[in-house]
Design a protein with these regions (language model features):
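Basic, amphipathic N-terminal segments that precede the first structured/catalytic domain
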Residues: 1-3, 139-140
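Active-site beta-strand-loop-beta-strand hairpin of nuclease catalytic cores
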Residues: 2-11, 19, 66
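Short, solvent-exposed loop/turn segments at secondary-structure junctions
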Residues: 16-19, 89-92
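Acidic, metal/cofactor-coordinating or nucleic-acid-engaging core segments within structured domains
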Residues: 21-83
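Extended hydrophobic secondary-structure segments that form protein cores and membrane-embedded regions
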Residues: 12-13, 81-89
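Polybasic (Lys/Arg-rich)
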Residues: 88, 95-140
Length: 140
């Protein structure tokens, strides 16, 4: 919760060594998402690049997050979101493939790409065993 009592949904996607084949998504699926994109979305407009992963995956995640926020759920009300993608700095290919995504957003501050070490730094001293486990597990 923020200082002004807003509840923030934080979808986190962890990527390490993923690569994508850049296959175009199925047309019926593309059409479904294009039709649901409206002026309330943080996505400015549909562009052809969104029809290929990894951008297609990011669009779907963003739209799902927005759907949750707009659902006005009484049990789990959410006011806003920050979409976090955890990608090692060494995965240059994936980082370069998604670097255009924030440019297609009305508010690019809602999309963050962060290295796992940087994300885990706040727990390093307090949860040393967890930090060491994650460091070892995802070092490769």
């Amino acid at each position: 919760m923020t200082i002004d009592n807003k509840k923030i949904l934080i979808p986190i996607v962890w990527k390490y060594v993923e690569t994508y084949e850049h296959k175009r998504a199925v047309q019926t699926s593309i059409d479904r998402y294009k039709l649901r994109l409206d002026s309330s979305s943080n996505i400015k407009e549909w562009i052809e690049e969104y029809e290929y992963d990894p951008l297609y995956e990011l669009v779907r995640q963003t739209m799902l997050t927005e759907k949750i926020i707009n659902s006005e759920d009484d049990e789990f009300p959410v006011d806003d979101y920050i979409h976090i993608n955890v990608i090692p700095e060494g995965n240059i290919e994936l980082r370069s493939e998604i670097e255009c995504y924030p440019k297609g957003l009305k508010d690019s501050s809602k999309f963050i790409v962060i290295d796992p070490r940087q994300l885990m730094m706040p727990i390093k001293d307090l949860y040393r065993d967890l930090y060491n486990y994650l460091e070892e597990r995802y070092r490769k």
